[in-house]
C-alpha cells in the first residue's frame, strides 16, 4: 500500500495555505478568544478513571481511507448525544474532508449538542490549525508524532496550551514515544494502526505501554471492538480508549457504547490509568 500519510500531508498543506488566504490568523485569534471556554478534556478523563470506570473517547467518523463509508445515517449531534448517554467521557470528531468525509461544522454541531469535551481529530501541521480549532470550540487537538518534527510538534503544543486546550500526543513506535516524552502534555495515545500502511494490531499498545511513565495518561487507539479488547489493554495499564468505527457501525449507538464499557469493576486491577 502507498504511504498514506505522505499523501495526506500534501493535501493538508494545500488546505492550510488556502485557509490562511481565506481567513487570516488575526481574524481567527479574535474568534478563539470569544469562543466557548475549553471544557477540560484531560480533566473529564481523569474524573471517569477516579470513579473506577473506563474512560472512553468516543469518535464521530463518517468514513476512513481504509474502510470507505462507515455510517450512512450520519448525524453528528444525534451521535454525540448517543455517546454521552452511553457513558463516554469525551468526544473525538473527524474534521478532515478528503480522507474521512469530516468537517469542522460536524465538530461544532456535535459539541453544541452535549456537555462533553471535544477533540478536533485531524492532521495538524501548522499552528494556524490550532487557532482554527479553538475558534470553532475544540477543547483538545491531536499531535501525530509520525507526521511532525520535534520543533513543529512543540510549536503546536505551545499554541494549544496557550489557548487553554489539551493535547493528545499520538505515537506508534518507540522512537515516537521518546520524542513525545519531550513534550509537556500528559496524554499519550498509542495508535495500534500504522498510519503509513493502516495495518492494525493491539500488540503495539502491549509493547509500548510498559515504557510510558506512570504519570502520563495512556490512551489506546484503533483496533478496539469489544470488551475483551479493553480488558486486554487494561492488563498493560491502559484504561482510556479512543473508539470510533466499531461504534459507528451500530444501529443503537447508546446501547453499543454501554455494552463496550460494561464490566465488573471488582475485576479491574488497581492503579491503572
UniProtKB/Swiss-Prot annotation:
Pathway where this protein functions: Amino-acid biosynthesis; L-tryptophan biosynthesis; L-tryptophan from chorismate: step 4/5
Highest rank taxon of the organism: Bacteria
GO biological process: L-tryptophan biosynthetic process
GO molecular function: indole-3-glycerol-phosphate synthase activity; phosphoribosylanthranilate isomerase activity
Name of the protein this chain belongs to: Indole-3-glycerol phosphate synthase
UniProt keyword annotation of Amino-acid biosynthesis present: yes
Family matches, as HAMAP family: IGPS_B
Keyword terms: Amino-acid biosynthesis, Aromatic amino acid biosynthesis, Decarboxylase, Lyase, Tryptophan biosynthesis
Source organism of this protein record: Rhodopseudomonas palustris (strain BisA53)
CDD domains: IGPS
Sequence similarity: Belongs to the TrpC family.
EC class name: lyase
Reaction equations catalysed: 1-(2-carboxyphenylamino)-1-deoxy-D-ribulose 5-phosphate + H(+) = (1S,2R)-1-C-(indol-3-yl)glycerol 3-phosphate + CO2 + H2O
EC number: 4.1.1.48
Record-linked InterPro entries: Aldolase_TIM (IPR013785), Indole-3-glycerol_P_synth (IPR045186), Indole-3-glycerol_P_synth_dom (IPR013798), Indole-3-GlycerolPSynthase_CS (IPR001468), RibuloseP-bd_barrel (IPR011060)
Amino acid at each position: 500500500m502507498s504511504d498514506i500519510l505522505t499523501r495526506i500531508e500534501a493535501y493538508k498543506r494545500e488546505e492550510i495555505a488556502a485557509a490562511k488566504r481565506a481567513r487570516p490568523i488575526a481574524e481567527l485569534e479574535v474568534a478563539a478568544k470569544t469562543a466557548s471556554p475549553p471544557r477540560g478534556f484531560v480533566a473529564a478523563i481523569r474524573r471517569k478513571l477516579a470513579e473506577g470506570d473506563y474512560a472512553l473517547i468516543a469518535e464521530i467518523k463518517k468514513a476512513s481511507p481504509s474502510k470507505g463509508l462507515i455510517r450512512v445515517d450520519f448525524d453528528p449531534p444525534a451521535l454525540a448525544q448517543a455517546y454521552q448517554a452511553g457513558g463516554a467521557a469525551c468526544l473525538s470528531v473527524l474534521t478532515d474532508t478528503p480522507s474521512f468525509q469530516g468537517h469542522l461544522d460536524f465538530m461544532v454541531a456535535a459539541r453544541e449538542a452535549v456537555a462533553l469535551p471535544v477533540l478536533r481529530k485531524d492532521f495538524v501541521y501548522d499552528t494556524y490549525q490550532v487557532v482554527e480549532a479553538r475558534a470553532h470550540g475544540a477543547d483538545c487537538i491531536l499531535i501525530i508524532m509520525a507526521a511532525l518534527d520535534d520543533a513543529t510538534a512543540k510549536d503546536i503544543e505551545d499554541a494549544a496550551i496557550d489557548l487553554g486546550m489539551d493535547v493528545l500526543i499520538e505515537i506508534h513506535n518507540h522512537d515516537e514515544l521518546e520524542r513525545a516524552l519531550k513534550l509537556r502534555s500528559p496524554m499519550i495515545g498509542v495508535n495500534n494502526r500504522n498510519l503509513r500502511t493502516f495495518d492494525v494490531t493491539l500488540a503495539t499498545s502491549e509493547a509500548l505501554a510498559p515504557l510510558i511513565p506512570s504519570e502520563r495518561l495512556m490512551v489506546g487507539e484503533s483496533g478496539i471492538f469489544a470488551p475483551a479488547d479493553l480488558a486486554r489493554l487494561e492488563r498493560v495499564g491502559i484504561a482510556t480508549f479512543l473508539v470510533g468505527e466499531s461504534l459507528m457501525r451500530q444501529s443503537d449507538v447508546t446501547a453499543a457504547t454501554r455494552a463496550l464499557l460494561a464490566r465488573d469493576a471488582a475485576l479491574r486491577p488497581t492503579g491503572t490509568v
